[in-house]
Swiss-Prot record:
Heme binds at Y356. Keywords: Cytoplasm, Heme, Hydrogen peroxide, Iron, Metal-binding, Oxidoreductase, Peroxidase. This is Catalase-B. It is found in: Cytoplasm. PROSITE patterns: CATALASE_1 (PS00437), CATALASE_2 (PS00438), CATALASE_3 (PS51402). The gene is catB. Induction: By srfA, in response to late development signals. SUPFAM superfamilies: Class I glutamine amidotransferase-like, Heme-dependent catalase-like. Belongs to the catalase family. It comes from Dictyostelium discoideum (Social amoeba). InterPro entries: Catalase, Catalase_AS, Catalase_clade2, Catalase_clade2_helical, Catalase_core, Catalase_haem_BS, Catalase_immune_responsive, Catalase_large_C. Its EC number is 1.11.1.6. GO terms for molecular function: catalase activity; heme binding; metal ion binding. It catalyses: 2 H2O2 = O2 + 2 H2O.
């Protein structure tokens, strides 16, 4: 148990001690289901303090949801530093090998309300709170390395545009509507980020299969006081990969909690999600080495130019005990930094330093939100702040001001020092004329969007074209559609623009402005997801379809083999009743074909069976749809023995992800290989005729 979990233990109750129900002031109850009335049929009496206390508490159970990132999932874990990084930063949690720091992570979507579906197309928030020995450090990032706007002043406009439209609160959790494309069509700095969202990055397969990015340039300050600019990255050990759009939409309807559930189940089963924290480092005087400004949050530094240096590893190993108390009340603030970590002058970051503390005041109801158990630091904390709503600490002593003599000057100030000193901002030299001007170095809005497009594989490009087509087609105003294509897409890539324009029936209009000069559009292979797979099948989900007459050994051997390789295998049947195998053994399905459709899995195995089982399956429309849908979603499918006739029945064209054999031994290696490649991309051009 780490320091944070130990601390939380003190606040936990299992409601079995005391044994008897009481009011909030400890008075035991003799009735908790009937109000106090004047006679059994009489009116309720105002005197009923038990009823009033219960209803009053209920009436106030909700707090405002986050204005953005309302839908999210949280869990506990720890961070392990790979080594002593003190040459880079004096941050204590990176100061020695295997230094272990408790963390709480919250991964979220951005635009949807709390009850929206997990698999909508969106940016995903990736926020980590490190409970370090020197105070809390919050790294509040996203699963994409760039942002839509360059200056904090546009954030409210951006959010108003992307969230549900004000007159009818539609659409829920989706950017496919007029106000978003109206804003972005008029705001070219958003081009790069919108492209990321339209790529497969916008629909990750699970929470553990996505990267995290700090986005802004921050500073590391080392023991000598030297500053190095740093961009922080989280790389998932499970690899980075995504759903298909059709899958994502169907999952949103059949299990809107899909991501949350999968994350929860992985943690419960001991298959812990892990990420490596890495840093791109840039000496102060090297910041001009690029053709873009490293203070501009719409730009990334290609990894091929500046490699990501590994710093440590995060393991997420424990679900919360109470969603509201932990995940909902956790308060991330960009302003929570520790000595050794500091800000840059990125104008978006500067606004964020203010915004998070400010928003917690209304969301969590006052200035004492850091005293809520999930937010409390694990190191001692003290200052002269007092009072306010829901103050928990009982401060003793007569003086709550600095300086004081009455309390002998306590709490004292700590000198900044090489390590374990007080926080002191990096002494950056600043001078300038007050103005609203934006730096000329922020003017190039398209080079990196083109670089991202050029970095995509063919199937990723096809998905982007389809995503823009879907999204912009949902805009009801023709001028919004036309402007987005002509103001934005044309400037990213002509093929992209032409294909989307054709699909939307939009005319590409010759622009009167001079062509945009682009720099650095060379592909960056690190941006393309097929290059980011883990090479294994850890945490992949496989369904095994069993019906009466299935071969017991084939099921068990396949299951054992795949589980040894780290996959999660579920036995699925038409009902939850026990299934009698060909040799008389019994198997218990864990899910049904209807309740656990193939969209919830990465691969399907239909084991060796008797003719009887084959007949049952061939006559079952739900099963046939299951296979067709898995095929359409480019999944690995294997048939054992006689069931392979189903392939012919469904007229599925052969490819390397459709496997036939007489039992698991014939297909297991190819199954593993195909699944480790995530999807059977070669099939994609052939599936448009599949009716699923
Ligand atoms: C000026 C620009 C921005 C402003 C003003 C802003 C403001 C906010 C606000 C008010 C919240 C709700 C916080 C809460 O109620 O607890 C929030 C959440 C969040 N923001 Fe931002 N944001 C900005 C840009 C960004 C950027 C660039 C990123 C990514 C690098 C980001 C990542 C997040 C994340 C991950 C959360 C959810 C935190 C959680 O899980 O509780 N935001 N933001």
């Amino acid at each position: 148990m780490n320091k944070k979990l130990e601390q939380l233990e003190k606040f936990k109750t299992n409601d079995k001690n005391p044994v008897y129900s009481t009011t909030n002031t400890g008075v035991s109850l003799s009735d908790d289901a009937n109000s106090l009335k004047a006679g059994p049929r009489g009116p309720t009496l105002l005197e009923d303090f038990v009823l009033r206390e219960k209803i009053t508490h209920f009436d106030h159970e909700r707090i405002p949801e986050r204005i953005v990132h309302a839908r999210g999932t949280g869990a506990h874990g720890y961070f392990l530093s790979y080594k002593d990084h003190s040459k880079l930063t004096k941050a204590d949690f990176l100061s020695k090998q295997d230094k272990k720091t408790p963390v709480f992570i919250r991964i979220s979507t951005v635009q949807g309300p709390r009850g929206s579906a997990d698999t909508v197309r969106d940016v995903h928030g990736f926020a980590v709170k490190f409970y370090t020995d020197e105070g809390n450090y919050d790294l509040v990032g996203n699963n994409m390395p760039v942002f839509f706007i360059q200056d904090a002043s546009s954030f409210p406009d951006f959010v108003h545009a992307v969230k549900m439209e004000p007159q009818n609160e539609m659409p829920t959790g989706g950017s496919a509507h007029d106000t978003f494309y109206d804003f972005c069509g008029l705001k070219p700095e958003s081009a790069h980020s919108v492209l990321w969202v339209m790529s497969d990055r916008g629909i990750p397969i699970s929470l553990r299969h996505q990267q995290g990015f700090g986005v802004h340039s921050y500073r590391f300050i080392n023991q000598e006081g030297k500053s190095t600019f740093v961009k922080l990255h989280w790389k998932p050990l499970s690899g980075t990969c995504s759903l298909l759009w059709d899958e994502a939409q169907k999952i949103a309807g059949k299990d809107c909690d899909y991501h949350r559930r999968r994350f929860w189940e992985d943690i419960e089963s001991g298959d812990f999600p892990q990420w490596e924290l890495g840093a791109q480092l840039l000496d102060e005087d090297l910041q001009k080495k690029f053709d873009f400004d490293i203070l501009d949050p719409t730009k990334l530094i290609p990894e091929e130019l500046t490699p990501v240096i590994p710093l440590g590893r995060m393991v997420i190993d424990r679900n919360p005990d109470n969603f509201f108390a932990e995940t909902e009340q956790v308060a991330f603030c960009v302003s929570h930094v520790v000595p050794g970590i500091d800000f840059s002058n990125d104008p978006l970051l500067q606004g964020r330093i203010f915004s998070y503390l400010d928003t917690q005041l209304s969301r969590l109801g006052g200035p004492n939100f850091n005293e809520i158990p999930i937010n409390r630091p694990v190191c001692p904390f003290a200052n002269n702040q007092r009072d306010g709503i829901h103050r928990m600490t009982i401060n003793k002593g007569g003086a709550s001001y600095f300086p004081n003599s009455i309390d002998k000057g306590y709490p004292l100030l700590k000198e900044p020092s090489a390590n374990k000193g007080g926080f002191r901002p990096y002494p950056e030299n600043i001078s300038g004329t007050k103005s609203y001007d934006r730096s000329e170095t922020f003017e190039d809005h398209f080079s990196q969007a083109t670089m991202f497009w050029n970095s995509m594989s063919q199937h990723e490009k096809n998905h982007i074209i389809a995503a823009y087509t879907f999204e912009i087609s949902k805009c009801s105003r023709p001028e919004v559609r036309t402007r987005y294509v002509n103001n934005i897409l044309v400037n990213i890539d002509s093929v992209l623009a032409e294909k989307v324009a054709k699909n939307l029936g939009v005319k590409i209009e010759p622009t009167s402005t001079k062509p945009i000069k682009k720099i650095m559009v060379k592909p960056s292979p690190a941006l393309s997801q097929p290059n980011l797979l883990s090479g294994d099948i850890v945490s992949r989900r496989i369904s095994v379809i069993i019906e009466k007459g299935v071969d017991y050994d084939d099921v068990i051997n396949f299951k054992d083999d795949m589980e040894k390789r780290g996959a999660m295998v579920m036995l699925v049947s038409s009902t939850l009743a026990q299934v009698e195998c060909s040799g008389g053994e019994m198997l218990s399905p864990k899910g049904t074909i209807i309740g656990n459709p193939s969209i919830f899995f990465d691969a399907v195995y239909v084991p060796k069976s008797t003719e009887e089982a084959t007949k049952i399956l061939s006559d079952d429309g739900n099963f046939l749809h299951y296979i067709l849908e898995a095929f359409k979603h480019l999944k690995t499918i294997a048939f054992g023995g006689s069931v392979s006739v189903i392939k012919e029945l469904l007229r599925l064209p052969q490819d390397h992800g459709l496997l036939l054999g007489n039992g698991y031994k014939d297909i297991t290696e190819q199954f593993f290989y195909s699944l480790a490649h995530h999807r059977v991309w070669e099939r994609e051009s052939k599936v448009s005729k599949i009716p699923a």
